[in-house]
Amino acid sequence: MSYLPCELHCHTVHSDGKFTVKELQNNANDDHLALIALTDHNTTSGCDELDDNILPSIKGIEWTTYFGHMLVLGANGFVDWRDAVPDNIDDKIKQVKAKGGVVGVAHPYQLGSPMCTGGRWEFNIHDWRNVDYMEIWHQSFSFDNYENDKAVELWTSLLDKGYRISATYGRDWHSNDDKGHFGCTYLDIDGEINQKNALAAIRMGKTIVSTGAKMFFRVHQKGNTYNIGETLRKGLTIFSFFIDLHSREKNIIDDEIEYKSIKVITNGGECVMESAITERHVRIDLKRNHWYRAELWGTINGIEKPLVITSPIYTD
């Protein structure tokens, strides 16, 4: 279990970014990231320039359409995005999955036209089982950001319907011109850090969305231990929390951060437990056919918000 900081939404001069591919990888190294995904708009031309000796990287693309932006990671071949429209997106996603790709919804509530044509998600997905992840947090953190709040609400509603969708953060990294408090996605990568194992972590729900601090949990039940993304039975459990508040401390710039509590959230956004961050082991009686995620709450510059959100565990 590693939980390594990754950036899964990056652009270069092959679309509208300012980095060359090598500059992007070097900047990610300087930012102490373990892995990136190159997701230029409607092109994979930069992927051939990726050098895993500089930094392990995922080959991807951001489908940039009039009806939303969709991230495709690791597909073994081309799927035509140019004729993607609201009512054929399920078929398009199936084509991506058939080529081994991982599918993510980018910034579903970003401002659309005229600010960013197609930036808001307007595709009509009927089978969310084929969607692997959703960007619930996007770009720099300003905590009056309704776009992120709405994305978390959408993700929660899909979890309630039984869809197992991983949560991610996307910096949407184009350059270093923009200043701000940028987060990361922590991936629990099993084995070597590479595209294959990173994609497996996303598929399996082993993801944590964070403003910087690292928090994850394990669940103990009847002699067995379960990790984020896994499924267990209903009944009495012990949740064990692991927290590193200084994991990416350099990224907080001048923000004043205070970490206050851990919450466990379940169906409907209900909080079933809240404890001080010093309390690392709690008992929770899990219900059948539910999901449970952990959130680290605190304040940034006096505004109270979740600072870490994990993907859930599930009960059957």
Predicted regions and their residues:
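Short, structured coil segments at secondary-structure junctions
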Residues: 52-54, 130, 163, 182-183
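Metal-dependent active-site segment of extracytoplasmic phospho-/sulfohydrolases and closely related
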Residues: 159-169
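Short hydrophobic/aromatic segments of transmembrane alpha-helices and their interfaces
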Residues: 26-27, 157-160, 191
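Structural motif
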Residues: 28, 123-129, 160, 254, ...
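C-terminal functional module detector
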Residues: 1-3, 23, 166, 173-316
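A metal-dependent hydrolase metal-coordination microenvironment
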Residues: 1-116, 120-123, 129, 135-155, ...
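Generic secondary-structure transition motif, activating predominantly at the C-termini of alpha-helices
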Residues: 97, 159, 203-206
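Extended two-metal-dependent nuclease catalytic cores across DNA- and RNA-processing enzymes
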Residues: 132, 162-164, 207
